[in-house]
């Protein structure tokens, strides 16, 4: 396990408010390494697929995405030793694309005329 994996899900629980004797707490999921709650399912999916023998280090993972799941998958794939291809709409923000690429993912942008899921057949 890489050091960064220790931080996925280990986010602070903070008191937000108290109404009478009831306390309201919130989890600061933005403190996950890739910045969202999506880090949890991303690392779990990859680790479960590894454990079940469906994927092995060095394989290329492919996902159609438009946001935080793609960023989390790019991070998780990188730290677990996988290549990652992410298919996104061309309208995706440049910040998202750059973040995914920073984790080593290949980002394939598709036009609105193309269907993201159908574009998987061209890879």
Regions found by a protein language model. Give the residues of each.
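PLP-dependent amino-acid enzyme catalytic core
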Residues: 1-121
């Amino acid at each position: 396990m890489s050091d960064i994996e220790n931080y996925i899900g280990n986010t602070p629980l903070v008191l937000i408010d108290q109404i009478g004797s009831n306390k309201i707490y919130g989890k600061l999921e933005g403190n996950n390494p890739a910045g969202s709650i999506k880090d949890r399912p991303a690392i779990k999916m990859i680790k479960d697929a590894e454990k079940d023998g469906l994927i092995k280090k060095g394989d290329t993972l492919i996902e159609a995405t438009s946001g935080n799941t793609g960023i989390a998958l790019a991070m998780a794939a990188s730290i677990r030793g996988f290549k990652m291809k992410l298919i996104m709409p061309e309208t995706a923000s440049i910040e998202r694309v750059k973040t995914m690429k920073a984790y080593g993912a290949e980002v394939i942008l598709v036009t609105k005329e193309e269907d993201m899921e159908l574009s998987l057949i061209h890879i």
